[in-house]
UniProtKB/Swiss-Prot annotation:
Protein's UniProt keywords contain Membrane: yes
Protein name, as recorded: Hemagglutinin glycoprotein
Gene Ontology MF term list: host cell surface receptor binding
Assigned keywords, A-Z: Glycoprotein, Hemagglutinin, Host cell membrane, Host membrane, Host-virus interaction, Membrane, Signal-anchor, Transmembrane, Transmembrane helix, Viral attachment to host cell, Viral envelope protein, Virion, Virus entry into host cell
Function according to Swiss-Prot or TrEMBL: Attaches the virus to cell receptors and thereby initiating infection. Binding of H protein to the receptor induces a conformational change that allows the F protein to trigger virion/cell membranes fusion. The cellular receptor might be SLAM, and may explain the lymphotropism of the virus.
An annotated GO cellular component: virion membrane
Upper classification of the organism: Viruses, Riboviria, Orthornavirae, Negarnaviricota, Haploviricotina
Record organism: Canine distemper virus (strain Convac vaccine)
Family annotation (InterPro entries): Hemagglutn/HN, Sialidase_sf
Length: 607
């Protein structure tokens, strides 16, 4: 007997086989016939293939036709280009050669003939008198029977252009980097170090004179765009054999050239020697545009007369070109032209510059106009706070109770006009030190930096912005303040105290560097250590930082003169320094002139 499960399994297995057999029979039955829709699909596929073949054939034909057309056009263009090339070679090149020959040889000859014709006609109509081109009003309305002669003027202009052309290669080697910054970049996060070195002057005229035991009493130096100028009083030992006086005035000018190891060297190219007379005892200096200019007087204080009652003293004008024996070497005495309210000017050690053929200096001046305004500024400031200057009863450099003003001296150097010294004045921050004003060129077009040196360690000096244009203004820049008690345009210089620093025997002039960013330098003769030293202070007011570097001296003495002039060379600070001192042991006066270099570097920089 089979169990229930065996029966059930047998039943389902048999049933499954029966069903499978039945299905296979059905499939074989349907496989013998094809449905009509399958034939329709095959027909559509055949038609599509034929259509694609037809489209491909048409596109291939079009591409072949386009390629043939492009080849034909390209061949035509190449034939035309070849024809143009032959036309240029065969026709235009000989034509250009003919034109060049005509312009190079015939045109100058024709122009010379026209020039000679004009000169002949001019000489014919103006037969009697020579004409000085510097009288410009004669050009506009010339007098009758005046012979026009442009020879002197044209020669002067031609010489200036030739000198500029000859000097340009020398200046190009010196100018790169002349206005770059000397300080480490802002990203410097470590300590800033300075390294200094002293270099002797080897090819300068003054150094050759000093080496012959001649004594230089004082020296002014100015440097501008690769050119330097000097003036100084010289007392050589053998002067009795050459001049009747005990001192001679020397002017020299030259280039700053690259020397060994790319260091700067002051090479003299032209100089002038004058016997020290009544007009060359005190001289200023200005350098620029390959020219040196100087104003010389007998006494520092020059009285200005505006009527016939007084005899106006003249001022000696000296100009010197970069190369010798040229019209720029000139000596002439001129009568200054000043504002009627001006009474005096005070000329001492003044450094100016030449720009647009105009030499400009700044000097202390005394004017009667607007005195009450200046006095009111000081009185209002002193009412509530006793500033050290409030107790002054005499004002430098003229003395008395009148406050000095700022005077501007301008001297046009254009060959087309006569030499004329113009003096104007204006007021600005109160002047406490009347010994010297310097004027430095500014990147701004119509202004410069006017500096007044410090004094006795109590007066820090002044740096103002002074205009060069018709409107002469002096605007405070640094080292001044506006008292709260005063109103209007009232500024006072910073005065620390009345206690004199005994360790600082003398302070130099205040120098503004020719960098794009505002920087200034000052030097002092310091005896605070066992070795005497000249200490340089370099200031960056924008970043409110300053750096110092001392140069130790091998000698000791009491200095009576210290003057510096600084410039930038290969991103380093270079300064020409001249100082005189009386030796403690020998009791003799010694003059020292040299170059110093200060290199600033950063120990660590941020990336």
């Amino acid at each position: 007997m089979l169990s229930y499960q065996d029966k059930a399994g047998a039943f389902y297995k048999d049933n499954a086989r029966a069903n499978s057999t039945k299905l296979s029979l059905v499939t074989e039955e349907h496989g013998g016939r094809r449905p009509p829709y399958l034939l329709f699909v095959l027909l559509v596929l055949l038609v599509g293939i034929l259509a694609l073949l037809a489209i491909t054939g048409v596109r291939f034909h079009q591409v072949s036709t386009s390629n043939m057309e492009f080849s034909r056009l390209l061949k035509e263009d190449m034939e035309k280009s070849e024809a143009v090339h032959h036309q240029v070679i065969d026709v235009l090149t000989p034509l250009f050669k003919i034109i060049g020959d005509e312009i190079g040889s015939r045109l100058p000859q024709k122009l010379n003939e026209i020039k000679q014709f004009i000169l002949q006609k001019t000489n014919f109509f103006n037969p009697n008198r020579e004409f000085d081109f510097r009288d410009l009003h004669w050009c506009i309305n010339p007098p009758s029977k005046v012979k026009v002669n442009f020879t002197n003027y044209c020669e002067s202009i031609g010489i200036r252009k030739a000198i500029a052309s000859a000097a340009n290669p020398i200046l190009l080697s010196a100018l790169p980097g002349g206005r770059s910054d000397i300080f480490p970049p802002h990203r410097c996060s470590g300590a800033t170090t300075s390294v200094g070195k002293v270099f002797p002057l080897s090819v300068s005229l003054s150094m050759s004179l000093i080496s012959r035991t001649s004594e230089i009493i004082n020296m002014l130096t100015a440097i501008s765009d690769g050119v330097y100028g000097k003036t100084y009083l010289l007392a050589p030992d053998d002067i009795e054999r050459e001049f009747d006086t005990q001192e001679i005035r020397v002017f020299e000018i030259g280039f700053i050239k690259r020397w060994l190891n790319d260091m700067p060297s002051l090479q003299t190219t032209n100089y002038m020697v004058l016997p020290e007379n009544s007009k060359a005892k005190v001289c200023t200096i200005a350098v620029g545009e390959l020219t040196l200019a100087s104003l010389c007087v007998e006494e520092s204080t020059v009285l200005l007369y505006h009527d016939s009652s007084g005899s106006q003293d003249g001022i000696l004008v000296v100009t010197l070109g970069i190369f010798g024996t040229t019209p720029m070497d000139h000596i002439e005495e001129v009568i200054p032209v000043a504002h009627p309210s001006m009474e005096k000017i005070h000329i001492t050690n003044h450094r100016g510059f030449i720009k647009d053929s105009i030499a400009t200096w700044m000097v202390p001046a005394l004017a009667s106009e607007k005195q009450e305004e200046q006095k009111g500024c000081l009185e209002s400031a002193c009412q509530r706070k006793p500033y050290p200057m409030c107790n002054q009863t005499s004002w430098e450099p003229f003395g008395g109770r009148q406050l000095p003003s700022y005077g501007r001296l301008t001297l046009p150097l254009d060959a087309s006009v006569d030499l004329q010294l113009n003096i104007s004045f204006t007021y600005g921050p109160v002047i406490l030190n009347g010994d010297g004003m310097d004027y430095y060129e500014s990147p701004l077009l119509n202004s410069g930096w006017l500096t007044i040196p410090p004094k006795n360690g109590t007066i820090l000096g002044l740096i103002n912005k002074a205009g060069r244009g018709d409107q002469f203004t002096v605007i405070p820049h640094v080292l001044t303040f506006a008292p709260m008690e005063s109103s209007g345009n009232c500024y006072l210089p910073i005065q620390t105290s009345q206690i004199i620093d005994r360790d600082v025997l003398i302070e130099s002039n205040l120098v503004v560097l020719p960098t794009q960013s505002f920087r200034y330098v000052i030097a002092t003769y310091d005896i605070s250590r066992s070795d005497h030293a000249i200490v340089y202070y370099v200031y960056d007011p924008i970043r409110t930082i300053s750096y110092t570097h001392p140069f130790r001296l091998t000698t000791k003495g009491r200095p009576d003169f210290l003057r510096i002039e600084c410039f930038v060379w290969d991103d380093n600070l270079w300064c020409h320094q001249f100082y005189r001192f009386e030796a403690n042991i020998a009791n003799s006066t010694t003059s020292v002139e040299n170059l110093v270099r200060i290199r600033f570097s950063c120990n660590r920089s941020n990336p």
